[in-house]
Amino acid sequence: MAIQTSNLGYPRIGLQREWKKTLEAFWSNKINEEQFLTTMKEIRLQHVKVQQEKGIELIPIGDFTYYDHVLDTAYMLGFIPSRFSEFTSYLDVYFAMARGSKDHVASEMTKWFNTNYHYIVPEYEEGLQISLKDNRPLRLYEEAKQELGVDGKPVILGPYTFLKLAKGYTQEQFATILKQLVAPYVQLLSELHAAGAQIIQVDEPIFASLTKEEVQQAKEIYEAIRKEVPNATLLLQTYFDSVEENYEEIITFPVSSIGLDFVHGKEGNLNAISKYGFPADKTLAVGCIDGRNIWRADLDEVLTLFTTLQKQVQTKDLIVQPSCSLLHTPIDKTEETHLSTELFDALAFANQKLEELVLIHSALTQGTESISNELETYRNVHHTIRSSAARNREDVKAARTALKEEDFSRPLPFEKRYELQQVALKLPLLPTTTIGSFPQTTEVRQTRKEWRNGIISNEQYEQFIEKETEKWIRYQEEIGLDVLVHGEFERTDMVEYFGERLAGFSFTKNGWVQSYGSRCVKPPVIYGDVAFINGMTIKETVYAQSLTEKVVKGMLTGPVTILNWSFVRNDIPRKEVSYQIALALRHEIELLESSGIRVIQVDEPALREGMPLKEKDWDAYITWAVQSFLLATSSVANETQIHTHMCYSNFEDIVDAIRALDADVISIETSRSHGEFIDTLKHTTYEKGIGLGVYDIHSPRVPSKDEMYKIVEQSLQVCDPKYFWINPDCGLKTRRTEEVIPALEHMVQAAKDARSLLKTNA
């Protein structure tokens, strides 16, 4: 039996975020197109070289992108919205789709399955001519071959997942459009095969959650493709969960290899193999290293997995690979020497995961004695971190044990609370607010850097933060907003900020991962029991409130978002970690309330993304996610108004969960998704406070008052004006001041116009 090492995808951003810096330099006209393309090529080839040097045999080609791999596929197949027809060059069209332009909104952006990566949603329009507009995978395959002598493994997004992720068609049209994808995929695969590609990875993560009818539909497409390209070696790759429910059918697909996730879908995939076996004429690609977390693998557990598989699988070959693309992990841990030895030793970033694949390959091909020293090291590392004091706090265990049913609910129902809050807050009809953050200018970032490097004192830094806060309180007053925010100038990241102030967290220096486009985040590491230490937001919020007679919101990140946007310890259930975070935030919320803050926002933008892919698993997740939010927020007085915020998700799946959060007001992204949530509310009622975002903050364009008014008008057709709020889609941290102020002025004017109309019609 031949055994090969493979990788599904490599982080794009570069060890020092060179990719991000190159993108942003190009967007700001600091480099020209030729310089941009040259630098991107250097980064792309460097990533291939690293994987080659680590000993990976099947190196992914085509996983590299200038923004997003789904957008790459949309452009390649001609899914280009007509509103961008004025643009002629590839990069102009491509980035207009991703970021919008002065006159046109960007394509929608949403979460990639249940990860914190965002993809650009492909748009189908009537009359669209689907064809292979650009065989980018072929160009990159030939580039790696010519420049480095690497016969790589082209990676493409499969036709079924691609179309399922797209929008703009009716369900009745789906089958017809799917058939139209056959010809361009045939051409794509034919050209790759003709160029010498030995194996082509076709990603179909959607296969983890399809109905039996959908799987049959997908199979027919693969049969049509195989008929035209009989000799191409295709690896059908699934990930993020098992394909247990449809495994029996999937293993009959006309492909040469099938990739399964034995980390996040281990139990289901093993059950399926035990029941149905695996085709002897296909290669099994075993996703055995976690591509979504940062912990060293349990090599003993992985080798036991292969022992089990080799007893049950009579395949000719095996491939050893990560569970999914390493896009979701930082690149290399070698710079993290500031961490404690027990934590550093327990980590494995992308490059270390590649090394683990090679270790496993050695054990499988040469026997476990060939890696006996490494096995002993791994066992010691796991024992040390498991038995550490940080993971065994008695106070945290006692607080969890003491929880009672009443800790998870507010004293009064929403309607009665809201009446009391209206009396206390004295807000107008259709109150206006923002989501929390204001522009993190070059000056803000530079001053923070100087403070962290010891160039300026704590006192100087605090004075600067107070100056920025006061400036933006005055801006908000002048604009005419009703509920103000302090601006979050002291925060680099909405999760990192809280993690730095809670026990149980640690932070990397260079643990960056891509969130969307050039936006990179550095997730905290939850390695121990989480506990409250001191007040985290009191000083800045109370200072902001002292500057104005208007209401200032306290701003916190919710427990489920902190959990989902962190790298989380894997020795206890995620539910338990979430409850620990919730208890710490509960303490902070009580401190804010006792300090006179009457509106407190607890953001949960990541609640939806944490949902399992399979609908049968949703209820269990939603139950503890909602309970975590309630645990954090339920100890305040009825007069204290709890807000929450969510963005970029398929909300129709979780309307009931949103309702169960029992937040007094929820703000939700609406404009970038082109009003889809408004459509959802046409079919259900939401009887609590709600603000549907009236403009997309991820685009530099300043929307007109009329655009925003139109969204307000549409929203009021499905929302009770008594409970309706007006706000942007999301925080304004990434925007420039000269974009923010006119946009908010337009928003306030739209609110005034809507109030006038409501009074006229009353």
UniProtKB/Swiss-Prot annotation:
Cofactor(s), by name: Zn(2+)
Binding locations of 5-methyltetrahydropteroyltri-L-glutamate: 17-20, 111, 519-520, 565, 609
Catalytic residues, chain numbering: 698
EC number: 2.1.1.14
InterPro entries, sorted: Cbl-indep_Met_Synth_N, Cobalamin-indep_Met_synthase, Met_Synth_C/arc, UROD/MetE-like_sf
Positions bound to L-methionine: 435-437, 488, 603
Pfam assignment, any one: Meth_synt_2
GO MF terms, alphabetically ordered: 5-methyltetrahydropteroyltriglutamate-homocysteine S-methyltransferase activity; zinc ion binding
EC class (word): transferase
Gene Ontology BP terms: methionine biosynthetic process; methylation
Binding site residues for L-homocysteine: 435-437, 488, 603
Family label: Belongs to the vitamin-B12 independent methionine synthase family.
HAMAP family from the UniProt entry: Meth_synth (MF_00172)
Protein function: Catalyzes the transfer of a methyl group from 5-methyltetrahydrofolate to homocysteine resulting in methionine formation.
Official protein name in the record: 5-methyltetrahydropteroyltriglutamate--homocysteine methyltransferase
